[in-house]
């Protein structure tokens, strides 16, 4: 089973959009996948579920339940550690790690774990999402929304991953805003300064076919278990 932790350079950069497209391409290619959203916030306007959890379940056509993919959820779209403190919920690295590792014995080809926001999103006053990724020891897929500021945010995230010896499996350029100019130039700059070639560039009207090449990279036998 391949395992990947999906993070963004920031919040609202399209992580869940990318996750659902990866799910779609796996489903079309009969690749057995499961995408977890261990920590979620922000209730959907259509149900009692958090919006990101609902989107993932919809991508799977509800063959999984919310409890199978999500451990902790908050109705308010607020930073997890803040709303956790307000509601007296403990976002424990140990509990999250156990929730994720309990899926390792399932018959899956690939396991995605979609994070909450960026790499250093706090879970508490003394822990961040980085601590969970380090505990899991699995590669990261980084999503960057190409816009003003993305070069700095992407390079900072890649540098921090490298500083902690976390493998970057690939990074995705989410070009979902047609008003942004010089997207190719921004992507090239990130590639040149980071040393990591963009795994795939996703346009506003992308479909699952745009993720075929990326899925082949992720499922390749060269990728570490």
Swiss-Prot record:
Positions annotated as active site in the UniProt record: 37
GO molecular function: ATP binding; dethiobiotin synthase activity; magnesium ion binding
Domain of life: Bacteria
Subcellular location field: Cytoplasm
Main location class: cytoplasm
Uppermost EC category: ligase
Residues holding Mg(2+): 16, 52, 114
EC annotation from Swiss-Prot or TrEMBL: 6.3.3.3
UniProt entry keywords in alphabetical sequence: ATP-binding, Biotin biosynthesis, Cytoplasm, Ligase, Magnesium, Metal-binding, Nucleotide-binding
SUPFAM superfamilies the UniProt entry points to: P-loop containing nucleoside triphosphate hydrolases
Residues annotated to bind ATP: 12-17, 52, 114-117, 174-175
Pathway in which the depicted protein is active: Cofactor biosynthesis; biotin biosynthesis; biotin from 7,8-diaminononanoate: step 1/2
Disulfide bond residue pairs: none
Ligase listed as a keyword: yes
Catalytically driven reaction(s): (7R,8S)-7,8-diammoniononanoate + CO2 + ATP = (4R,5S)-dethiobiotin + ADP + phosphate + 3 H(+)
Swiss-Prot/TrEMBL cofactor(s): Mg(2+)
GO terms under cellular component: cytosol
Chain residues that bind substrate: 41
One Pfam short name: AAA_26
Subunit and partners: Homodimer.
Family note: Belongs to the dethiobiotin synthetase family.
Purpose: Catalyzes a mechanistically unusual reaction, the ATP-dependent insertion of CO2 between the N7 and N8 nitrogen atoms of 7,8-diaminopelargonic acid (DAPA, also called 7,8-diammoniononanoate) to form a ureido ring.
The name this protein goes by in its record: ATP-dependent dethiobiotin synthetase BioD
Native species: Francisella tularensis subsp. novicida (strain U112)
Gene label: bioD
């Amino acid at each position: 089973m391949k395992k990947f932790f999906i993070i963004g350079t920031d919040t609202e950069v399209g992580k869940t959009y990318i996750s659902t497209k990866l799910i779609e391409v796996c489903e079309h290619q009969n690749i057995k996948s499961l995408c977890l959203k261990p920590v979620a916030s922000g209730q959907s306007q259509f149900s009692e579920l958090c919006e990101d959890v609902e989107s993932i379940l919809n991508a799977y056509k509800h063959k999984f339940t919310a409890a199978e993919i999500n451990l902790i959820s908050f109705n308010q779209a607020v930073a997890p550690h803040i709303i956790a403190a307000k509601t007296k919920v403990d976002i424990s690295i140990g509990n999250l790690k156990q929730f994720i590792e309990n899926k390792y014995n399932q018959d899956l080809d690939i396991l995605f774990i979609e994070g909450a926001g960026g790499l250093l999103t706090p879970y508490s006053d003394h822990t961040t999402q980085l601590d969970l990724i380090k505990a899991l020891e699995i590669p990261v897929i980084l999503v960057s929304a190409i816009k003003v500021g993305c070069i700095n945010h992407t390079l900072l995230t890649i540098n921090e991953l490298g500083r902690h010896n976390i493998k970057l499996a690939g990074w995705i350029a989410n070009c979902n805003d047609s008003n942004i100019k010089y997207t190719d130039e921004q992507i090239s700059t990130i590639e040149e300064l980071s040393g990591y070639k963009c795994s795939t560039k996703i346009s506003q009207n992308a479909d699952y076919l745009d993720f075929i090449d990326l899925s082949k990279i992720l499922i390749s036998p060269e990728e570490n278990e």
